[in-house]
């Protein structure tokens, strides 16, 4: 479960940046094609945050859809599955977004 290591890194990054202030909320953006399971990150967050400035903070996750351009026909397509096909039947998609994993917002007091 790589989400544990990812969540540890998120907590560590936020804790370094807040300068000892208490964090009340963290908003993450996770692309549907990132390979990161949002529910697993939620499960790990409280464990990783324990004993840090993030202890007790609320975690909000915004899931981002994927988009790509078909290399065969040039059509833009929504891509929420790594095995998605274009309407023309081609699997040769240039994924433009949906692979993101970023900290969008941090609220501190």
Regions inferred by a protein language model and the residue ranges of each:
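A generic structural micro-feature
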Residues: 20, 80, 95-97
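Long, charged N-terminal interaction/targeting segments
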Residues: 1-55
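A short Gly-Trp-Pro
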Residues: 34, 38-61, 72, 95-101, ...
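Short cysteine-rich clusters marking metal-coordination/redox-active sites
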Residues: 70-73, 85-88
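Cys/His-rich microdomains that often coordinate metals
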Residues: 76-77, 90-93
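Short metal-coordination and nucleic-acid-contact micro-motifs, chiefly zinc-binding Cys/His arrays
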Residues: 63-67, 81-84, 99
């Amino acid at each position: 479960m790589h989400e544990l290591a990812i969540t540890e890194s998120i907590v560590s990054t936020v804790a370094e940046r807040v300068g000892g202030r208490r964090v009340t909320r963290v908003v993450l953006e996770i692309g549907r094609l990132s390979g990161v399971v949002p529910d697993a990150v939620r499960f790990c967050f409280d464990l990783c945050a324990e004993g840090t400035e993030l202890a007790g903070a609320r975690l909000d996750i915004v899931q981002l859809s994927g988009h790509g351009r078909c290399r065969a026909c040039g059509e833009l397509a929504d891509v929420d599955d790594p095995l998605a096909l274009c309407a023309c039947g081609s699997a040769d998609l240039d994924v433009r977004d949906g692979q993101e994993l970023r900290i969008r917002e941090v609220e501190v007091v």
